Amino acid sequence: MAPKKLSCLRSLLLPLSLTLLLPQADTRSFVVDRGHDRFLLDGAPFRYVSGSLHYFRVPRVLWADRLLKMRWSGLNAIQFYVPWNYHEPQPGVYNFNGSRDLIAFLNEAALANLLVILRPGPYICAEWEMGGLPSWLLRKPEIHLRTSDPDFLAAVDSWFKVLLPKIYPWLYHNGGNIISIQVENEYGSYRACDFSYMRHLAGLFRALLGEKILLFTTDGPEGLKCGSLRGLYTTVDFGPADNMTKIFTLLRKYEPHGPLVNSEYYTGWLDYWGQNHSTRSVSAVTKGLENMLKLGASVNMYMFHGGTNFGYWNGADKKGRFLPITTSYDYDAPISEAGDPTPKLFALRDVISKFQEVPLGPLPPPSPKMMLGPVTLHLVGHLLAFLDLLCPRGPIHSILPMTFEAVKQDHGFMLYRTYMTHTIFEPTPFWVPNNGVHDRAYVMVDGVFQGVVERNMRDKLFLTGKLGSKLDILVENMGRLSFGSNSSDFKGLLKPPILGQTILTQWMMFPLKIDNLVKWWFPLQLPKWPYPQAPSGPTFYSKTFPILGSVGDTFLYLPGWTKGQVWINGFNLGRYWTKQGPQQTLYVPRFLLFPRGALNKITLLELEDVPLQPQVQFLDKPILNSTSTLHRTHINSLSADTLSASEPMELSGH
C-alpha cells in the first residue's frame, strides 16, 4: 500500500477506535446464544473469522502494517497471547514499554477495525520460551507449574492483579475491542489435570474482570476431558488434515449448545532445527476453512502472520528427544515472516468473501527488499578474552555446578570453569551423566576448543591436559520446553561432569551478559586481543558497513558458518544454525538498518567453526528449507564500503 493510501485508511479507521472507548458501553454486548447456536454482538447474530498474530514476535513499528493487512484479508478479529515472561522479567518488575506495550497494540487493532480474542495464560505455549511462564519460577526447584501449588498460584495471582486491570477498560462491554478471553491454554494436554487450579483461575478472572466478559477454553480433541470446565465456554483446535465432523461431534459432548468454534485452525506449522520446513497446501487450508464456515462456525486461523523469535525467545518441544524451535516463526502463514501477502492469503480472502464482506480494493504489495554483499567480517576475539566484560561481577563459586535458574541467569549462555587436578596424558572420556547438559556445551581446555556435548547425544569427548589446566564449558540455553506434559526445564549442567573416573568439582559459574557487551562495549575501541592461529570455538566476529542508498527488508545469509547468535546494530536477531537447518537466513526488518551512508554494524558469536572466508550476504528472499535450491542472483564481489543498496534493491513477491 502506498504511504498516502495507508494514511488515508488509518484516518478513516481512527473514529472507530475512539468510538470503542466512549462511555456508551452499556449498549454493547458479546454473548453466546445457546438457543440458536451462535454468538450475538450487540444483539445481532455474529460470527468471527479471526487470525493469530503475536505482538511479541513483530517489532512495534510494524504492528500497524501487519494488522491492516489482516483486516484487508477479510478478518474481523485477531487473536493473540500475552506472554508473562515478556512482561515480568524478574519478580515484581514489570515492562509494558516499546514492543511490550500491550495497550498500544490493542489500540492499533482498534485502528484496524479488528475485534480481539485475548489469551493471557498464564501458560500460553505459542512455541515461546517456557510457554510464556517466567523462568524465575524455577528458582524454587520443587514448584509444580500449572497446578494449585500455593507457590505457583501466588505468583499467578500477583501477575494477573497487574495485567487484568490494564485490560479491563478494553473489554467490549466497557467500550473496548476485547470480546472474549481464554483461560489457560490447552490445559488438557498437560499431565496434571488439576481442576482446582482451573477453578482458581476462573474465579480470579471473574473477580478482576467481572461477569460480563465471555471466558473460554481451548483444547485439542484429546484434551477436552481435562481442559474444559463448567462456566467456561469450550472450544477446540484442529487443522485441515483432521476430521472436522468427528471433532465437532466430540465438542458437542462438552458444549451441547452454542456456536462451534475452532480456536486454532492451523494454516501451517512450526519448524524444528534439524527437520524440514513445514508447509500446508493452499487447497487444503482453504477447503477446511470453507467447510467450517458453511457450518456457521467461528474460526481463528493460527497463524495468520507468524513473525520471528528474536533474541533467545524460541521455545522447544520434547518428542523422544529435545527439539528446539527455529528463529523464524514464518509458520507458512498467509502473511510471510517479512509481512508480505502470499498466495494462501489471496485464496483465503476469496473464501471469506463468500460469507461476509471484505474491504474493497487491492491488498498492499510486498515491502521493498534489499540485497547486499558479500560482507567480510573481521575477527574480534575469543569469547574467553572478554570474560571480565561479559561477567563484570565475577564468578559464583560452588563445589558442584549450579543451574542457570540457581544463579538467576534466565537466557543465553553461562560459562562453567574448573581446573584439572592431575595430568592426563592419554585421551580420556569426558561426559555429563543422565543427559545432564541442558542444552549444548562447548568444551575448551586452556582455551582450545575440544568439541560439543549436547542434550540429545550420548557421545563422549576425549580430553588431555596438564595438572592445573583450565577446563571451560560454555553452556547454551536453546529455549525451554513450551508444550505438553513437560516438567520444569532447568538449564545448565544439571549433573557434575565426569572425566575418566573423576567427578569434577570446585566450579566457577560466569553468567554472561553478551547482549550488553555487543550493545555497549563493542562500539568502543577495545584493546587488541591476541588472535588464535586457527580460531575455533566461541569467537566474536564483526564488521561495520555503510548502505549508500535507501534500505529495504532483507535476509541475512551465513553460508559456511556453523552455529551462533547475530546482532545488527546491537539488536539481537536470534540464533542461526546453518549446519543443522532448515533455516538458512535470518529476517532483518529494514528499520534496524541505517541508510544513506550511515555505518551499520553486524556482530556474530560463532560457537563452533567459521568458513575459510568469513563472509555473510544480505539476500532479497528467505531460505527457510535447506533442502531447497537457492535461486542465486549474481552478486558482484564489491566491498561493503562501496556497494550501494539502491542498485540491487527490487520488489520481491508474487
From Swiss-Prot:
InterPro entries: B-gal_1-like, BetaGal1-like_ABD1, BetaGal_gal-bd, Galactose-bd-like_sf, Gly_Hdrlase_35_cat, Glycoside_Hdrlase_35, Glycoside_hydrolase_SF
Compartment(s) where it occurs, according to its Swiss-Prot or TrEMBL record: Secreted
Species this chain originates from: Homo sapiens
Gene, per the UniProt record: GLB1L
GO biological process: galactose catabolic process
Protein name as catalogued: Beta-galactosidase-1-like protein
A Pfam family assignment: BetaGal_ABD_1
Alphabetized GO MF terms: beta-galactosidase activity
Function comment: Probable glycosyl hydrolase.
Gene3D superfamilies in alphabetical order: Galactose-binding domain-like, Glycosidases
EC number: 3.2.1.-
GO (cellular component) term, any one: extracellular region
Family label: Belongs to the glycosyl hydrolase 35 family.
